[in-house]
Amino acid sequence: MSQATEFDYIIIGAGSAGNVLATRLTEDSDVSVLLLEAGGPDYRFDFRTQMPAALAYPLQGKRYNWAFETDPEPHMDNRRMECGRGKGLGGSSLINGMCYIRGNALDYDHWAKQPGLEEWDYLSCLPYFKKSETRDIGPNDYHGGDGPVSVTTPKAGNNPLYRTFIEAGKQAGYPETEDVNGYQQEGFGPMDRFVTPKGRRASTARGYLDTAKQRSNLTIETRAVTDVIEFEGKRAVGVRYEQKGQPKQARARREVLLCGGAIASPQILQRSGVGNPEWLKELGIPVVHELPGVGENLQDHLEMYIQYECKEPISLYPALKWYNQPKIGAEWLFKGTGVGASNQFESCGFIRSRDDEEWPNLQYHFLPIAISYNGKSAVQAHGFQAHVGSMRSESRGRIRLTSKDPHAAPSILFNYMAKEKDWEEFRDAIRLTREIIAQPAFDRYRGREISPGPDVQSDEELDNFVKQHAETAYHPCGSCRMGEGDMAVTDAQGRVHGLEGLRVVDASLFPVIPTGNLNAPTIMLAEKIADRIRGREPLPRASVDYYVANGAPAKQAS
């Protein structure tokens, strides 16, 4: 084994959280940091990861995607479902859909009601959302103007179907909101995106690491696959990893910071002897510390596509044609504008399916084309679709180690749709979506319903459609829950219970999945914990208003 090297901090995983920590910790010039990433660099010449409109490409193949699969999901016709996770500098921010959604204020207020998580209320989190962000139209009480992450807002003159979707939501009785990340998430409005002013994907590798990698106190090792965290007694003291087939070792003087994400973080903990002792003994792994919650509490968002043909030739369908792509690519490459510079998710909605929901439980992404997320099975016609999914399923799954081999995939079971409420929400989701698309705003555009199709009406027919066609939104989280109690893995600052010198900092900490996409909340969480690691005072709590429904009906009579 090569000579061990020593650093103050070792960060495992250069994803949305790990890159934040690497950048913030190395702002202190007397601190040395090693950042380990199992994937490769984020090649800036590769349009597949850099062009927002090409977001389907990195999900195909395994250069940038671990491309995990779930175990057969018992409530989903035993389908093995996709579980894509980013591989390379930027992690999943290198391959995600680039939607900049923070979640609902009440998500965080409800986290803060759990024992030990009092510091995670919305007004304590908002300053860290702002700290991380540069919004293209400037800062305000809810948005930042000088953070590492570029956020682009939709502009006038974009595809008319985006505005049509918002108008139809209003006609169906729902509110319009100017900013789903501002005062009021609930309603229909524009969707911001992680895209730079030059039309490039704003991954955390670009936003954070581009600054930090110039610093002499940061060492970045790519293609470095972590094997185990090493302990002396109950203290984490280093990491064993493999690089180009060679075993290597590094020691941490202060802390090991595990930022592998909701799949890899519990997997690495278990391989290192931290977790459910029964599971570890089955694999012959010596138990360093019993923590039965490692890998439990796994959550995700499921979603479906409700697709229609478009009667007017204004959808993005022509952009799929090979003969149109060179022009689109050239405009993006040289000007940073045009169809290539957008992820195409430019309007969205957050609604309550029933009056007794305290805050939105359904999310819409609207797309002016009919296609699946990974770019397959495009409808050969002008079309549009609404992606819809429930936000806070009570179903819980788990991540379980299958082998001591660091290259082996874990066993992943989300246990999707395990509760009766899941089925109620998805039936509501399909019926409410049809109601929205049936509004007068869509009359000029709405053609035949492609999917689920007009024949799918009864509860049983809708349930079968969900079983066969619902897909992951790629939002796994919760598998190393922060908090107190037997099943919590860390405290509110990511410190692993019962151990020293070890934190988990990523989406696996979320006790309950937020209402929306997970990249922005993951960056916020890492910014907040970075201050704790550095011994800095938390940023002062924000003092802004935010919308709470307080029993108002979910929709007004139209």
UniProtKB/Swiss-Prot annotation:
This is Oxygen-dependent choline dehydrogenase. Signal peptide: none annotated. The active site is at H475 (proton acceptor). NCBIfam families: betA (TIGR01810), PRK02106.1 (NF002550). PROSITE patterns: GMC_OXRED_1 (PS00623), GMC_OXRED_2 (PS00624). Belongs to the GMC oxidoreductase family. Pathway: Amine and polyamine biosynthesis; betaine biosynthesis via choline pathway; betaine aldehyde from choline (cytochrome c reductase route): step 1/1. Its EC number is 1.1.99.1. The gene is betA. FAD binds at residues 8-37. Involved in the biosynthesis of the osmoprotectant glycine betaine. Catalyzes the oxidation of choline to betaine aldehyde and betaine aldehyde to glycine betaine at the same rate. Its cofactor is FAD. GO terms for cellular component: membrane. GO terms for biological process: glycine betaine biosynthetic process from choline. The lineage of its organism: Bacteria, Pseudomonadati, Pseudomonadota, Gammaproteobacteria, Oceanospirillales. It comes from the Bacteria. Keywords: FAD, Flavoprotein, NAD, Oxidoreductase. GO terms for molecular function: betaine-aldehyde dehydrogenase (NAD+) activity; choline dehydrogenase activity; flavin adenine dinucleotide binding. InterPro entries: BetA, FAD/NAD-bd_sf, GMC_OxRdtase, GMC_OxRdtase_N, GMC_OxRtase_C. It catalyses: choline + A = betaine aldehyde + AH2; betaine aldehyde + NAD(+) + H2O = glycine betaine + NADH + 2 H(+). It comes from Chromohalobacter salexigens (strain ATCC BAA-138 / DSM 3043 / CIP 106854 / NCIMB 13768 / 1H11).
